[in-house]
Amino acid sequence: MELGLTGKRVLVTAASKGLGRAVAEALLAEGCRVCISSSSSDRINAAAREMASGGGEVHAIAADIAVAEDCARLFDWAVRTLGGLDILVNNTGGPPAGNVLEVNEAQWNHAFESILMSAVRLSRAAIPVMRQGGGGAIVNLASLAGKQPIDGIALSNAFRPALIGMAKTLSREAAPEVRVNNIATEHILTDRIRDIAGRIWRRDDESVEETIERKSREVPLGRYGTAQELANAVVFLCSDAASYITGVTLAVDGGLDRGLF
């Protein structure tokens, strides 16, 4: 299947590790020209060096996407560096685990800015540029928490649905030139999941690995997914193979979501 991604100009946020990095690496492997960002200069530059060592064009910048000025600076830099933009992948690290009564107001405000407003700002900036270049694709990395609350992650439960709702609305406004879709992930084994397993889900008599094994039995496919499997879904939604798909939220969760839609 021809994906039509060679030479596409890409920006992936929160890409120094975890899901964001896996997505950036997968798009790089398809021949895309990739810009990546993270709040940590050391981490994002190290990631760029490692990714570039395998071949391909990758550029890095430090930016805090929870800050409006950094979003603007990041976007302007990416467009200057690549000469335009064809694909935007909105990803956010975190937010911290915790229940509604535990999370403080500063954390609520930061999650609002980083999860929702970063995607709003970058998408609003990207669509005119993509239209000028003949079209494009935006993919937001959301969570199954956007469809059904998950114990212990109140911030995701609150703001991932808002992200999905914004993107669904935007998909109609941006059409036909720009497609906008979401990925709803859950039970993808990352450092964040290990942290949540250890601090929120673990029973007193369990190790973290035993907790992960127990939680994996909740998944119809019987295991946690990998970051690469998530990245494959993002690549598909960015590609010509998904040219008639917009406004969808694709669950990459091993069948964990019980919903009909």
Segments and roles (model prediction):
Residues 103, 149-157, 169:
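Active-site loop-to-helix junction immediately N-terminal to the catalytic Tyr of the SDR YXXXK motif
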Residues 9, 14-18:
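Conserved glycine-rich cofactor-binding loop
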Residues 148, 235, 246-261:
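Short C-terminal tail/terminal secondary-structure segment
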Residues 128, 172-176, 243:
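Alpha-helical segment proximal to the catalytic Tyr-Lys
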Residues 143:
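Residue(s) in the substrate-gating loop at a strand-loop-helix junction
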Residues 123, 159-160, 167:
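Active-site helix of classical SDR
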